[in-house]
UniProtKB/Swiss-Prot annotation:
Its main location: cytoplasm. Disulfide bonds: none annotated. It comes from Escherichia coli O127:H6 (strain E2348/69 / EPEC). The gene is ravA. SUPFAM superfamilies: P-loop containing nucleoside triphosphate hydrolases. Its EC number is 3.6.1.-. This is Regulatory ATPase RavA. ATPase activity is stimulated by ViaA.
Length: 498
């Protein structure tokens, strides 16, 4: 693939030209363009009058000298109206059954069939062969047809368990369109003077027949990396577990892979990337219910697994758990231990401070911060005399939170290990230790693991940033993925500060 980034830029400019004068149809144009560039079919679902036919007409201008055919199906439509009339002369003179196909579907590169589900069996059967094999049986001859894009449209879905399902399954991309929603776009649409049938594409951007044929071969050379296949298989397994998931044929999966290859190719990449998998949201649904379900499952895949978000959070959880274990071990070693005094006749157990604690004011560190009296507290200052009296006689004990202000009443106790423990209103406790006896900062083991995890996170974020330049993926999906990665990064940084 020569100059992949130049090709990606050209396709982006081509799409922008095709989108001119069409409001809130950028995604539809881009996916129809991708379908045309990879030889696939598109189904547009939506009410009348929302530019479905105009989208198909625009795609003709993506190619030099492309021929277009469009037809509105009715229940009375005949094969002659779609595939061409019979040649009376050939039948009369030579007894040959032959159609005159000039100007009809068999000789068109871009085909638009409106109200597709109203077509009769004779049309549907011939259409299936045309889509599957790009061939048309004209009498005794089997002719290759040049169709690059079939756009079928309707305001309804095919009935379940009908003869239409075979044709519906051949339509790889399925788009559900609606009226223009944004107020500014609606106004622009009403006041636009642009002739919708004018060619908006500069000749320099149009695709030649030679380019198209060459690209078909190069699309097939785009690789599918193992980690991307694993994501696809994960999605397939998850869908198989869901009772309401739509049936997705092996044929549809295989055709979808070629679409992903085309997305990568026209984005300037040599391999399919996780970001390309977002296209599956427009390939795997069957009806309104499955549309929402597919989008939910792909959202989980993209925000939880595609860039190892869930895996990194699992690793972070294990690191945090290990840190807590080390903290507990350190707490047992460094906590201030008071001395238990004898006293057979005493109603209350008595204690005293260790002999090496001699300062008149003691500053004791909390092994973990607590919220006391609406303040985040990391250390408490005690008057030595007050603490000795409390250890000996009990009663009320007060200390200055973080060493400032007035001494506040505290819920202090001596645990079974003879450590001083302060508790908050929810009775969460924190062991007290003398300054210098508590470990400072993160243990080296934890620090190293967090640094490695942060390095892996940065690599994943860089990979995502490099893959974002994909014309065919909506920006809101990219935003959700970015948010999921930023959330993982924030949790890692928070753990590093503990």
């Amino acid at each position: 693939m020569a100059h992949p980034h130049l090709l990606a830029e050209r396709i982006s400019r081509l799409s922008s030209s095709l989108e001119k004068g069409l409001y809130e149809r950028s995604h539809a144009i881009r996916l129809c363009l991708l379908a045309a560039l990879s030889g696939e079919s598109v189904f547009l679902l939506g009410p009348p009058g929302i530019a479905k036919s105009l989208i198909a007409r625009r795609l003709k201008f993506a190619f030099q000298n492309a021929r277009a055919f469009e037809y509105l199906m009715t229940r009375f439509s005949t094969p002659e109206e779609v595939f061409g009339p019979l040649s009376i002369q050939a039948l009369k003179d030579e007894g040959r059954y032959e159609r005159l196909t000039s100007g009809y579907l068999p000789e068109a590169e871009i085909v638009f069939l409106d109200e597709i589900w109203k077509a009769g069996p004779a049309i549907l059967n011939t259409l299936l062969t045309a889509i599957n094999e790009r061939q048309f049986r004209n009498g005794a001859l089997v002719e290759k047809i040049p169709m690059r894009l079939l756009v079928a449209a309707s305001n309804e879905l095919p009935e379940a368990d009908s003869s239409l399902e075979a044709l519906y399954d051949r339509m790889l991309i399925r788009l559900w369109l609606d009226k223009v929603q944004d107020k500014a776009n609606f106004r622009s649409m009403l006041t636009s003077q642009q002739d919708e049938n004018d060619n908006p594409v500069p000749a320099s951007l149009q695709i030649t027949d030679e380019e198209y044929e060459r690209w078909q071969k190069e699309i097939g050379e785009i690789t599918l990396p193992d980690h991307v296949f694993e994501l696809i298989f994960m999605l397939r397994q998850q869908l198989d577990k869901l009772p309401d998931a739509p049936y997705v044929s092996d044929r549809r999966w295989k055709k979808a892979i070629r679409l992903l290859q085309a997305s990568a190719f026209f984005s300037g990449r040599s391999a399919v990337a996780p970001v390309d998998l977002i296209l599956l949201k427009d390939c795997l649904w069957y009806d309104a219910q499955s549309l929402n379900l597919i989008q939910q499952q792909i959202d989980v895949l993209m925000t939880g697994h595609a860039w190892q978000q869930q895996g990194m959070l699992t690793r972070l959880g294990a690191i945090v758990q290990r840190h807590l274990q080390l903290q507990q071990q350190q707490s047992d070693k460094t906590a201030l231990t008071v001395i238990r005094l004898g006293g057979i006749f005493s109603r209350r157990q008595q204690y005293q401070l260790p002999v090496n604690v001699t300062a008149s004011t003691l500053t004791l560190l909390l092994q973990k911060p607590l919220k006391l009296h609406d303040m985040e507290v990391v250390h408490i200052s005690f008057e030595r005399s007050a603490l000795e009296q409390w250890l000996s006689k009990g009663g009320e004990i007060r200390g200055k939170l973080n060493g400032i202000g007035f001494a506040q009443k505290l819920n202090l106790e001596v645990d079974s290990a003879q450590h001083l423990v302060v508790r908050d209103v929810s009775l969460q406790g924190s062991t007290l230790a003398l300054p210098g006896s508590s470990a400072e900062g993160l243990p080296s083991e934890i620090k190293q693991q967090l640094e490695e995890l942060e390095s892996d996170w940065r690599k994943q974020h860089v990979l995502f940033s490099e893959q974002q330049k994909c014309l065919f993926i909506p920006g809101d999906w990219l935003g959700r993925i970015e948010a999921s990665l930023q959330d993982v990064g924030a949790q890692i940084r928070q753990a590093q500060q503990c």
